[in-house]
């Protein structure tokens, strides 16, 4: 008899979304209840990410810890999913024969059958295939108690940037049908969700088939989602600059529910490095798109991703990146030292930059953007911000929510305001956090 499920998730928002779906699937099929205590669970699932270096090390370290639990309880079921499972399924089977289930991002809907096989046949069940996007046809209706929710609208990526493993672990771009996405949003809205975050590895490549034979792009999808009763905010992530289209920019003029925050990964400010990365644009094109957007939304917050120390990056290339950061004024960033992903084209490039130089460059970028974050937060003091109330604080004496530009905001108020957008006058700001006084409900 199995009762409790524990999931450990590494990586991106897509993995968080997938993990939530695993919970729904196994609740529906086996009535498993999620627990935050691995030692009390009957089923342990590890949802992995292969974007960063040492993903394998992280995986096998965690499995080593779980093997001790399995030694104490031979009936414990251990499963590995996600991108590392997709990439290294056979290696996982070889190195950790005590693992019962191995599945990829596109086969998580088959978990109930795989779990039954593991329970009944006592042998490892493995499925890391790429069956189009059929998993969405087999998922139970979403369930949530939150006022915010992710909705996956497409999977995979067809850009094949030289540094990126995603096309090899999640496959090429496949879009969910338009009506499937709309129906999921409607269900979530009926459960009290007020903010929807549309997800995809390359979300603005969305091309969802419609009943009339037409195809919806992301801009049209956003326009329709905004009309769904109860939806007050819309976000989307992650975007590629190449497909940040004029129609998508125009959506910021047409759809007030589309928040004034955009995450648009640039990776580098150097045209030479962008060519080596096979990004498909130059820095001037990136800046042009941001200028167009800011004509419509002058106050929009821009965040980005940066890869530091990509092979061939010299001082001039790094300076070009710093110049871009200064010109755009990024609010936040996810910045990492380049790490080789086996199987990608860039894995064959010579790693010709000293690690200390990479660390110094990373530190400078992070310091610069952290200063930007602090400066913007300080400028918000005295302003009135629209905050979506998400919950009460752990101490229970305040409410918290987020501004459109992703600032965590704390203020005193009644818990009946959860799920509402309220006006808050900002009184303090530090880093990514704000404090304020409640004014009125919108």
From Swiss-Prot:
This entry's comment on the bound cofactor is: Binds 2 [4Fe-4S] clusters. One cluster is coordinated with 3 cysteines and an exchangeable S-adenosyl-L-methionine.
Gene3D superfamilies with a match to the protein in the record: Methylthiotransferase, N-terminal domain, tm_1862 like domain
Which co-factors does it depend on?
A: [4Fe-4S] cluster
What keywords would UniProt list here? 4Fe-4S, Cytoplasm, Iron, Iron-sulfur, Metal-binding, S-adenosyl-L-methionine, Transferase, tRNA processing
Asked if Iron-sulfur is a keyword of the record, the answer is yes
Q: Which SUPFAM superfamilies match?
A: Radical SAM enzymes (SSF102114)
Q: Which residues form the TRAM domain?
A: 378-440
Q: Does the keyword Cytoplasm apply?
A: yes
Localization (cell): Cytoplasm
The protein's name is tRNA-2-methylthio-N(6)-dimethylallyladenosine synthase
Q: Species name for this entry?
A: Vesicomyosocius okutanii subsp. Calyptogena okutanii (strain HA)
């Amino acid at each position: 008899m199995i009762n409790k499920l524990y999931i450990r998730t590494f990586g991106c928002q897509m993995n968080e979304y997938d993990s939530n779906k695993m919970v729904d699937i196994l609740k529906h099929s086996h009535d498993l209840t999620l627990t935050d205590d691995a030692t009390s669970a009957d089923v342990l699932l590890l949802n992995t990410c292969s974007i960063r270096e040492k993903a394998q090390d992280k995986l096998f370290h965690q499995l080593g810890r779980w093997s001790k639990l399995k030694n104490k309880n031979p009936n414990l079921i251990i499963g590995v999913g996600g991108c590392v499972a997709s990439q290294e399924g056979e290696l996982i089977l070889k190195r950790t024969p005590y693992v019962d289930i191995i599945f990829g991002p596109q086969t998580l809907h088959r978990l109930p059958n795989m779990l039954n096989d593991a329970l009944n046949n006592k042998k490892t069940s493995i499925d890391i295939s790429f069956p189009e996007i059929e998993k969405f046809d087999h998922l139970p209706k979403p369930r949530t108690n939150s006022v915010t929710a992710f909705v996956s609208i497409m999977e995979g990526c067809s850009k094949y940037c030289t540094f990126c493993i995603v096309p090899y672990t999640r496959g090429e771009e496949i879009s969910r049908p338009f009506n499937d996405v709309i129906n999921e949003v409607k269900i979530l809205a009926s459960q009290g969700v007020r903010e929807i975050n549309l997800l995809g590895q390359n979300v603005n490549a969305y091309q969802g088939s419609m009943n009339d034979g037409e195809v919806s792009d992301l801009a049209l999808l956003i326009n329709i989602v905004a009309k769904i009763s109860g939806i007050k905010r819309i976000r989307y992530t992650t975007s590629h600059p190449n497909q940040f289209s004029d129609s998508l920019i125009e959506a910021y003029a047409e759809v007030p529910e589309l928040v004034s925050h955009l995450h648009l990964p640039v990776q580098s400010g150097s045209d030479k490095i962008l060519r080596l990365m096979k990004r498909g644009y130059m820095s001037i094109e990136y800046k042009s798109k941001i200028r167009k957007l800011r004509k419509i939304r002058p106050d929009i917050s821009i965040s980005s991703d940066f890869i530091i120390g990509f092979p061939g990056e010299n001082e001039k290339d790094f300076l070009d990146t710093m110049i871009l950061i200064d010109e755009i004024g990024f609010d936040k960033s996810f910045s990492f030292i380049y790490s080789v992903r086996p199987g990608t084209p860039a894995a064959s490039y010579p790693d010709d930059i000293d690690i200390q130089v990479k660390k110094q460059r990373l530190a400078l970028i992070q310091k610069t953007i952290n200063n930007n974050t602090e400066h913007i937060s300080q400028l918000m003091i005295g302003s009135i911000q629209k905050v979506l109330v998400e919950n009460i604080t752990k101490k229970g004496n305040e409410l918290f929510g987020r501004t459109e530009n992703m600032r965590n905001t704390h203020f005193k108020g009644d818990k009946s305001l959860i799920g509402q957008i309220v006006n808050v006058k900002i009184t303090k700001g530090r880093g990514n956090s704000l404090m304020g006084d409640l004014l009125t409900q919108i």
